[in-house]
Amino acid sequence: MNLLDPFMKMTDEQEKGLSGAPSPTMSEDSAGSPCPSGSGSDTENTRPQENTFPKGEPDLKKESEEDKFPVCIREAVSQVLKGYDWTLVPMPVRVNGSSKNKPHVKRPMNAFMVWAQAARRKLADQYPHLHNAELSKTLGKLWRLLNESEKRPFVEEAERLRVQHKKDHPDYKYQPRRRKSVKNGQAEAEEATEQTHISPNAIFKALQADSPHSSSGMSEVHSPGEHSGQSQGPPTPPTTPKTDVQAGKVDLKREGRPLAEGGRQPPIDFRDVDIGELSSDVISNIETFDVNEFDQYLPPNGHPGVPATHGQVSYTGSYGISSTAPTPATAGHVWMSKQQAPPPPPQQPPQAPQAPQAPPQQQAPPQPQQAPQQQQAHTLTTLSSEPGQSQRTHIKTEQLSPSHYSEQQQHSPQQISYSPFNLPHYNPSYPTITRSQYDYTDHQNSGSYYSHAAGQGSGLYSTFTYMNPAQRPMYTPIADTSGVPSIPQTHSPQHWEQPVYTQLTRP
């Protein structure tokens, strides 16, 4: 009541200023005149006020309510108690109960609810433009200001309603309804999605840790190349965007690569994974390593210059490597040589003539290894044994090629050490690669690198799986060169597609 006094004074003054006639009624109402007259005077007085003083409406409401409520509230309560004109209280319970199979019985209204319901109706009629939320705030404030005598009628009505409610529902027990399953289901779904995303993200993070710039930047930058290289297990997580672009391919590659990934990280089962990993390494190495040369090769693939170049080149390199796939470690070394090749061109010169595919790394070993390649084309088994060793090297190399194989990238440091051209590894691996590459040439020439990669889930063809169709032209020549990686590839990265390579590959 005290809080409302200033409001009442203000409103009285405003009312006097606005309309002289209504002000006496207001004073009468506040004095305790019957509620209807008070309500009428309030309506007349406050509407002009509301229009004139929009900001003062809450105050007017409060004061008008204050004026009415001692009288009007009692009147409303008396109406409810006497005639049940105010039937909303019992009716909702009964209506709801009848409407539902298992009727939901509402709790009986307490004193404040009785007051709020009656007062809200009166106020809503008088001030239809008022917002319901504002009404609720005002009603709550007024209720706190009421004294015991003013609250008594509402308390009595609430008690009457409680007794009546107990009669109507003798077995009623308050059972608050709890919302079920929606939040839980959503949470479960979110958890599942989080888990789903966690594994790729974790892998991707691991890859990034292995090759921070190359795994994140290169895989993303080389979306075309990586798409082809998505089959590479590690690259796929880093290349989540790529996964979206080539979801199907990525899935196939992932299926082909799961073992490779598992083997890659702790074991050196790069026989299956090496080719793809080498492709990844090649791609990342190419980035750092022969972006210009790869740009030359990019046009055939139709990929944009640098990223395509990286993807293509790395695939080219990976072809060389994939041809070395039997000797994934060797391929890794070769790629490492590439990756390191830019720093050590002297080592590359022998390699450079050989392979545009794996320009520096593969090139140097392949020339001396041309004979060994053909000879050791039979040594695929040897390469298989070597791949373990060379695969370890490979893993390191893959680190050098951060984009595609995080695991390889992890191993890249070692491969870098091998980058000084582990010719011993290269020699056996290249001969192995020679036949592997020849096989790749067939697959690449077939023009379905992905299908071959999928079918050829074994490390060698998986590399081709990484190749993008756009990069196929390069790969086909590269495949040929990788078939004879040491000889034709070394001629020049530009000459990857030379028919000579194909011929060499065929032997």
Swiss-Prot record:
It holds the Pfam family Sox_N. Transcription factor that plays a key role in chondrocytes differentiation and skeletal development. Specifically binds the 5'-ACAAAG-3' DNA motif present in enhancers and super-enhancers and promotes expression of genes important for chondrogenesis, including cartilage matrix protein-coding genes COL2A1, COL4A2, COL9A1, COL11A2 and ACAN, SOX5 and SOX6. Also binds to some promoter regions. Plays a central role in successive steps of chondrocyte differentiation. One of its GO terms (molecular function) is RNA polymerase II cis-regulatory region sequence-specific DNA binding. Residues 224-307 are annotated as: Transactivation domain (TAM). The gene is Sox9. Residues 341-369 have a biased composition (Pro residues). The keyword Nucleus applies. GO terms for biological process: anterior head development; aortic valve morphogenesis; apoptotic process; astrocyte fate commitment; bone mineralization; branching involved in ureteric bud morphogenesis; bronchus cartilage development; canonical Wnt signaling pathway. A motif (9aaTAD 2) lies at residues 290-298. The modification Phosphoserine is found at S64, S211. Residues 30-41 have a biased composition (Low complexity). Residues 56-67, 160-174 have a biased composition (Basic and acidic residues). This is Transcription factor SOX-9. The transactivation domains TAM and TAC (for transactivation domain in the middle and at the C-terminus, respectively) are required to contact transcriptional coactivators and basal transcriptional machinery components and thereby induce gene transactivation. The 9aaTAD motif is a transactivation domain present in a large number of yeast and animal transcription factors. Homodimer; homodimerization is required for activity. Interacts (via C-terminus) with ZNF219; forming a complex that binds to the COL2A1 promoter and activates COL2A1 expression. Interacts with DDRGK1. Interacts with EP300/p300. Interacts with beta-catenin (CTNNB1); inhibiting CTNNB1 activity by competing with the binding sites of TCF/LEF within CTNNB1. Residues 392-507 are annotated as: Transactivation domain (TAC). Residues 42-52, 378-420, 483-507 have a biased composition (Polar residues). A motif (9aaTAD 1) lies at residues 275-284. PANTHER family: SOX100B, TRANSCRIPTION FACTOR SOX-9. A motif (9aaTAD 3) lies at residues 458-466. One of its GO terms (cellular component) is transcription regulator complex. Residues 63-103 are annotated as: Dimerization (DIM). Residues 63-103 are annotated as: PQA. It comes from Rattus norvegicus. There is a cross-link at K396 (Glycyl lysine isopeptide (Lys-Gly) (interchain with G-Cter in ubiquitin)). It is found in: Nucleus. Acetylated; acetylation impairs nuclear localization and ability to transactivate expression of target genes. Deacetylated by SIRT1. Residues 105-173 bind DNA.
